[in-house]
Amino acid sequence: EITSPIDLVTADDGLVASHFGHPVIGLKPSQIAALTQICSTDTSASVTAEASRDWWPLTMHWGLVGEVPAQAAAVCRPTSTEQIAHLLSYCNEEQIPVTAAGGRSGVCGASIPLYGGVVLDTTAMQGVVSVDDESLTVEILPGTFGPDLEAHLAPMGLTVGHYPQSFDIATVGGWVACRGACQYS
């Protein structure tokens, strides 16, 4: 299963460099503690570096020399819309930048946290909530990957019929956010 661009080359301490080199907004210990109370939060260098890039070809090249475009201070993984609302409200109050990300399958750098802060990773919100076989509608959580959605629908004789090139590594939330248009769509 490929869910990440190429492996990052890191220094012995696990750190990577920011390619853009401009100042980014870090987090105070009190802010990290508050974020941790809201949802799962990771501040480790390896996790924040990985979450700070996508499939943009330049980021893959920079990864070979241990660089990410810009690095988030934390990766937050909410599991509910209530946690997302609380997280966004808190970050707004504290003036912490937030960059939304899912599968990070984009190739233009849209999920790069240019100003640091928090990456709001939706991939902890996976699954199919409901399927209405009469109206042929499905309610899906935003972090659900394309193959998982199709695997859930196939036994019912249903398909979404949406197959972007990034199908295996893209999430439904990303399809919606980017007005996904693709082959067979």
Segments the model singles out, each with a brief description of its role:
Residues 1-89, 106-136, 165:
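N-terminal flexible segment immediately upstream of the FAD-binding catalytic core
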Residues 81-185:
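FAD-binding glycine-rich core of flavoenzymes that anchor FAD
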